[in-house]
């Protein structure tokens, strides 16, 4: 017989688990409010409700001092103080429970465990089964035929839940029954709750005693029958055992009364939950909304909790607001207007007429691939006004639609008109898809994705629309239309009638978000200027770079692959010979067996500590150290390097060549790094090693077109020049202004010698110290890097600060600004949130290291982006055919016809060196030219 089911939630236990499990994620709203614990709690709770599908649910919370504290002053003593960030999130957790209309139970003088134990007993008496959802194993003592425990362990962003019934409890505790677990804690104690137990008896011994005597009382009555090693302990600490059991026993007669009708699932106001999720900026991608219980009926006004916050909720006053003076909250959006599907010439002509009179429009594309250059256009959506939205299908299968060529002819003039502003979300992607169909986009006036990222918001359109526009329900996702995994179909297979509302909504959301995000940027003048001066025009630059791509010498790469394969085979043979036989070199376990077993290497002699699995982590650093004594370690390290390069680049790159263009088209993430730097993927061309011969061999495969040359322009020591400007250090500024070798000049001051007397080692040390300091290195870290004593490393750092006091001043001022504001910023106002500067211990130390470097690295990234925009514009204005291809670290790589090499190089140097004239030190640009990415020669120009 199936009984009704009640889920009882240990609110405090789950809240704490979620807080500490997800703390490192740093999840926050764009206003700076920490939300990671709320998210983790919601994820556990809603997943459980979706999986167990209970009829009823209730939550119990602790309320402070309990009878156990009165019995034992040291109860739970020694626990770390609850971090401040927990409390506002705990209030949000209670708001979530209230919004779901789940009753909350508390009892003065009792813990949540006691309340849960009482409610579970009452449920059983009323013929209702119970699942207790908790993160605390103490409640396993409550398990019986009608009570189970779902024990949640949310770590690393994922939640593992184990459901314990009687059999599972017996398995965990080697045959003990749940009603023996309080006795177990009475014997072994509990360090987490500071329950003493019997000193000298651990869990293994306690379980053995309870299996022999069944109960603590029976054991204490027959101490003489216990193993001799325990007899004295038990006689001397019998009262401690009984007292510990009393502390560990969950009370089941707390003065609370279970109200099943109030606990019925599905009687809640869904809009209140939506409002809370929007306030916390939990979007569609989190999947929380899909896990919400179905609304059986909305609660009456009398049934709603009196203290349920009105929607939209306001930010707790204790939280930092990064956007003071933000525009007014959006009002909930009504149902989107009907979409016009442009299926024939008449509808297309009507759209053209509307576009002719439109002051601006938002657009979006649907296509067949996530790789825009390799994709086919399926449809275009256009929003001219909130009530004028259309979808133009051009590539759906078996559908009546206007031929793509006719659509392109009709719409291309509007997209190409620079005087007609256009808005998009992830415009670069859509512009590349349209370019493939023959439509060039000019006049891009706003990209909501880039604006959202600069404002510290989540960048997905569906998430952004949901919480910024206060949509009553989450938008349809692409997975809702095309499915997932093996069952996924192409968008071209989606019927137009289903595709149109989805596609048109994206354009409409973009139109509405543009107005809202524009106002938010206007409230932040520095970000507003950076957005319109750098990030927005950069979109066109990156679009052109990605569309251009770079040529790959595939025959050379095939030959290189054969060469690498032979080298790897030779290495494998040599490794086998040294190991005394073949083994799986890629297996960590087998590598452990060979190095520390068969070859007898002592891991402790090299400072290695065991993993939980019992083996040792054999990292590149470990192999580097071992290689000084054992040739096999050097060979294994080389084997790893070669196999990684071969699989990542040599084998993979040919598959990434676009058959339409014969070139590789990497994709740039405009805000891919927290500092604002660009990142690239598919493939990642920024990670190809440059300092090793193998890396240079791979770079040699990237070649210029016949009759063209690569021209590379590299900023020299840009981060140190930025440091000189931002620190205002006179000595550092003077060295750059005089054109000195900065590392030799630094070494001269650091070691107290004449610049001409600085040797190579002193220069190397000075370079390491300076870069280490601006990356927040400690004396310990510097000592390790240089292989010197820590005291000497500290002395070097102190000497640097003494000779360059502006650097010390910059560090102190940056950290103080970060602590006060919760973020640090570049010279141009780009922010990086640094809430952990207010934390303690290792988290604060890590945040301080990042905070010191972020403004420097971020400003260098801003300067590079400005240079890219200016170079792109100058090339066009001067009518040169030269085109930008790559941006790697501090370097721009262009491809120029042979007769344009010198003018292109001069343009690159002049534009890049003058990108920001207010810098107090000159920007120096080194030039190189060559037929491929490796064989580049310095280019000297007057």
Curated annotation (Swiss-Prot):
PROSITE patterns per record: DNA_POLYMERASE_A
Top-level taxon of origin: Bacteria
Reaction equations catalysed: DNA(n) + a 2'-deoxyribonucleoside 5'-triphosphate = DNA(n+1) + diphosphate
Enzyme class of the recorded protein, top EC level: transferase
Keywords recorded for this protein, A-Z: DNA damage, DNA repair, DNA replication, DNA-binding, DNA-directed DNA polymerase, Exonuclease, Hydrolase, Nuclease, Nucleotidyltransferase, Transferase
Protein purpose: In addition to polymerase activity, this DNA polymerase exhibits 3'-5' and 5'-3' exonuclease activity.
Family stated for the protein in its record: Belongs to the DNA polymerase type-A family.
Protein name (Swiss-Prot/TrEMBL): DNA polymerase I
Organism of derivation: Chloroflexus aurantiacus (strain ATCC 29366 / DSM 635 / J-10-fl)
